[in-house]
A protein has these predicted regions:
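N-terminal small-domain helix-loop-helix segment of the aminotransferase-like
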Residues: 4, 8-120, 127
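Conserved core segment of the aminotransferase class I/II
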Residues: 4, 11-12, 242-289
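Active-site phosphate-binding strand-loop segment of PLP-dependent enzymes
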Residues: 161, 166-236
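Short acidic capping loops at alpha-helix termini that bridge into adjacent secondary structure
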Residues: 109-115, 135-138, 185, 246-249
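A short helix-loop-beta submotif of the ANL/AMP-binding
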Residues: 155-161
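Conserved PLP-anchoring active-site segment centered on the Schiff-base-forming lysine
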Residues: 131-153
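Helix C-cap/helix->beta junction micro-motif
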Residues: 47, 156, 216-217, 247
Length: 289
């Protein structure tokens, strides 16, 4: 018996089509807030289970509405919002960020050109890690962490190195563990305060200890302070930039949590400290903004 090709010379062999896989750079990237756990929860919801989702800070679904003043301002400004803004974001909003921090005693001075607006803090985290990290650079990140920091570091070619926040010490960072994990490849340290997910609010003593380590090893400080106005039981928030005005510090914040508008994606990042030591980094930010 002859094969099909001999019987029908007009028939061509089946072409093997290209398969599109995810990029290799994603192999070490995980983001469980939107990964398998979230997918399992959605599947259980479809099966009729009532799932209480604690994975994302999303106050709107629990009936916490945005303040009326924000809603009114958005509606009033819609007719004037069709055009592109400057690459760093609209000037009135950046000016408002400067004014906000001028009201905080001890916060180092910065100006409107040091402020970047983003599609939430998440976009700004990715922008900063892309501008800062070369392949193999290490970033110290708290454990447990907000997983975007680990994912963004990996996606940018860096290596996340996790330092311990000890549950038996009220979830405070272990300064000893941080010191043990600094090496010649360490480029930055992430400080999430108030912390997500633990809720810990760090004392001045802890923050000064972290600043001392960053100062000794000339690390950039990446201060995630999105929950700075969500405080309980008399807790007081202290900014990293306040205790480390001599260090290059990127402070991240936004409207999402304090003003219950996470869906509006309104975040900012500003740089404080000796910016002359970060001119190339700033040029990278301006390129990506």
């Amino acid at each position: 018996m002859s094969d099909d090709t001999n019987e029908n010379p007009q028939r061509k062999p089946l072409k093997k089509h290209r398969h599109f896989d995810q990029a290799d750079k994603l192999k070490n990237v995980a983001y469980d807030l939107r990964g398998p756990v979230a997918a399992t929860a959605e599947e259980m919801e479809r099966d009729g289970h009532n799932i209480l989702k604690l994975n994302t800070g999303n106050p709107g679904i629990f009936g916490f509405d945005a303040p009326d003043v924000i809603m009114r301002d958005i509606i009033a400004n819609l007719p004037h919002s069709q055009a592109y803004s400057t690459s760093k974001g609209i000037i009135p909003a950046r000016r408002a960020v400067v004014t906000r921090y001028e009201e905080i005693d001890g916060f180092p001075e910065f100006d409107i050109d040091d402020v970047y607006l983003g599609n939430g803090v998440s976009e700004l985290i990715n922008m900063v890690t892309q501008a800062l990290l070369n392949d193999g650079d290490e970033v110290l990140i708290p454990s447990p962490d907000y997983p975007l920091w680990t994912a963004a570091t990996s996606l940018s070619g860096g290596t996340p190195v996790h330092y311990i926040c000890d549950e038996e010490d009220d979830w405070n960072p272990s300064l000893e563990d941080i010191r043990s994990k600094v090496n010649d490849r360490t480029k930055a340290i992430v400080v999430i305060n108030p912390n997500n997910p633990t809720g810990a609010v760090y004392s001045r003593e802890i923050l000064e200890g972290i600043a001392d380590i960053a100062r000794e090893h000339e690390l950039m400080v990446l201060a995630d302070e999105i929950y700075d106005r969500v405080l309980y039981d008399g807790a007081k928030h202290i900014s990293m930039a306040e205790v480390a005005p001599d260090l290059v510090t990127c402070t991240f914040n936004g409207l999402s949590k304090a003003y219950r508008v996470c869906g509006y994606r309104a975040g900012w990042m500003m740089i404080t400290g000796p910016k002359r030591r970060a001119t190339g980094f700033v040029e990278g930010l301006d390129l990506l903004a």
